[in-house]
């Protein structure tokens, strides 16, 4: 019976006259502007304390994994609300010298560099220096001689390169060994041609080459070398003083040596120098610096008022965290044996996915000879994980998933809840009055143009009066049960013989 009553009320007041432009509606009702619209917020004031209670178990998880996988040294961290809240370490940065890893040890992060490159491109776009839909050959003339796979293939654009949709073949680990090539060598490679595995714009295929070309575009559009542009416009404003593209810039007492596990022993891998392919995988950084970097992306959520404080606009950082090129769904098995369904795709220099626990996961891993790294965060939860290891292609995906599962059990890993706009709250109060005592003039003032065309006012009045007769006199209740967004919500009206569930969606119109 309750379900029938709920659906009836929903149908009766499915649309109330409001506004999709909250500023106009709020000003008419409450004297507020859109800048006063509340941002989504965390409901539990003890959330951070609960998350902190998971740190010891997270440390045990990462240490056990490092031991099991023969990782010489590892660092991991947890970022909460834009701050590096915890760092854990184990093992050695230099096996021969028995030099331990610490929170300031600097590791290569390989393909995680791609997000820095994408961020630089969006910054240049925001400054009007390029368009994502520019043909890549506008900035890299060597690409004008490419032989496309079909006569109807579009020219490769910057957008294609940013989302691995340019049609180049997957090139791991070939790309790793190209880091040190010179600009002239790269130009010669491009002039000699690049084969296509797909026409541009039709499929995702991971391309280190594509992000190397983006580095060339950053250089051309900014008027300064890629490395300098990244340092001056992104790293320096963020205070990332331990981050660089050149291993020779790192003090010997801080750099992690890279190893491979072979013949039951660790074997030293040479440090690959920076070169023309650095924009796809050359970055080195520390846990502190990467915590700042991940915190920057988390700070872009939720959309909110206030000055821009980062090197790139918050809206552009959110754009980076939205799927641009979908990938097929996959099923994997978690460490506890549970099946997990993943869907998502590639964004701009970042991967985006969803699973059975979290709808929006942003991440990128990195792997080079001697190193493996990961950054992963949950925008709606304000929490991220970072990890570094100095063994070839260390895969941190499993421990990171386990760490989120541990935090989930504390009850502190919860998403922000949307807050109602002033106009939605005003409409809830008015609709509650209408349900308690029908008034034709009030109904007319609330109704969107469709409401009484879909079903006449007299019929809707009769339906509400019938419900009220069944459950008895009703009261307005206090607040919303569910706020889906600033203009849609549900609440409960307690009645003498039951309750009514009410939902409203405000129409995309401004009040007269």
Model-inferred region functions:
Residues 363, 374-377, 381-390, 502-503, ...:
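Short, well-ordered beta-strand elements
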Residues 325-335, 359, 387-459:
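Short, gly/Ser/Thr-rich active-site loops of penicillin-recognizing serine hydrolases
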Residues 2-22:
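Bacterial N-terminal signal peptides that target proteins for export
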Residues 479-512:
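Exposed beta-sheet edge and beta->alpha loop/turn motif
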Residues 89-95, 148-367:
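Short, surface-exposed loop or secondary-structure junction motifs
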Residues 59-62, 76, 82, 108-133, ...:
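Active-site SXXK
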Residues 48-109, 129-131, 145-146, 183, ...:
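Short, conserved catalytic-motif segment at the N-terminal edge
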Residues 440-484:
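Short solvent-exposed beta->alpha transition segments
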């Amino acid at each position: 019976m309750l379900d029938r009553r709920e659906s009836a009320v929903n149908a009766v007041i499915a649309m109330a006259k409001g506004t999709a432009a909250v500023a106009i509606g709020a000003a008419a009702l409450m004297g507020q502007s859109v800048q006063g619209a509340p941002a989504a917020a965390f409901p539990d004031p003890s959330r951070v304390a609960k998350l902190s209670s998971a740190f010891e178990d997270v440390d045990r998880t990462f240490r056990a994994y490092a031991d099991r996988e023969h990782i010489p040294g590892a660092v991991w961290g947890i970022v909460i609300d834009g701050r590096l809240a915890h760092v854990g370490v184990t093992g050695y940065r230099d096996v021969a010298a028995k030099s331990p890893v610490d929170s300031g040890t600097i590791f290569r992060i390989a393909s995680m560099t791609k997000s820095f490159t994408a961020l630089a491109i969006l910054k240049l776009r925001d400054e009007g220096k390029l368009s994502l839909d520019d043909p890549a050959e506008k900035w890299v003339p060597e690409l004008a001689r490419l032989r496309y796979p079909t006569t109807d293939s579009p020219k490769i654009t910057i957008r294609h390169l940013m989302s691995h949709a340019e049609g180049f073949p997957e090139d791991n680990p070939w790309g790793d060994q190209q880091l040190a090539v010179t600009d002239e060598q790269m130009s010669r490679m491009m002039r000699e041609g690049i084969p296509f595995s797909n026409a541009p714009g039709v499929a995702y295929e991971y391309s280190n080459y594509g992000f190397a070309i983006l580095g060339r575009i950053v250089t051309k559009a900014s008027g300064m070398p890629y490395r300098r542009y990244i340092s001056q416009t992104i790293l320096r404003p963020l205070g990332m003083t331990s981050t660089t593209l050149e291993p020779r810039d790192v003090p010997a007492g801080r750099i992690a040596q890279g190893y491979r596990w072979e013949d039951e022993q660790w074997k030293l891998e040479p440090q690959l120098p920076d070169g023309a392919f650095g924009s796809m995988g050359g970055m080195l950084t520390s846990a502190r610096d990467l915590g700042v970097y991940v915190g920057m992306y988390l700070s872009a959520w939720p959309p909110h008022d206030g000055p821009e404080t980062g090197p790139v606009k918050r809206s552009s950082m959110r754009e980076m965290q939205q799927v641009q090129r979908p990938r097929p769904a996959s099923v994997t098995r978690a460490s506890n044996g549970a099946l997990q369904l993943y869907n998502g795709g590639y964004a701009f220099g970042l991967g985006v996915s969803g699973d059975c626990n979290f709808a929006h996961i942003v991440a990128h891993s990195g792997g080079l000879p001697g190193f493996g790294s990961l950054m992963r965060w949950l925008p709606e939860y304000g929490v991220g994980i970072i990890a570094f290891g100095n063994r070839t292609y260390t895969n941190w995906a499993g421990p990171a998933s386990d760490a989120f599962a541990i935090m989930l059990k504390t009850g502190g890993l919860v998403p922000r809840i949307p807050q109602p706009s002033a106009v939605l709250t005003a409409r809830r109060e008015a609709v509650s009055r209408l349900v308690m005592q029908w008034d034709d003039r009030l109904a007319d003032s609330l109704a969107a143009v469709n409401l009484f065309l879909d079903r006449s006012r007299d019929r809707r009045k009769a339906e509400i009066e019938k419900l009220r007769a069944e459950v008895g006199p009703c009261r307005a209740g206090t607040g919303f049960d569910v706020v889906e967004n600033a203009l849609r919500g549900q609440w409960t009206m307690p009645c003498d013989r039951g309750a009514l569930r009410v939902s409203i969606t405000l129409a995309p119109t401004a009040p007269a």
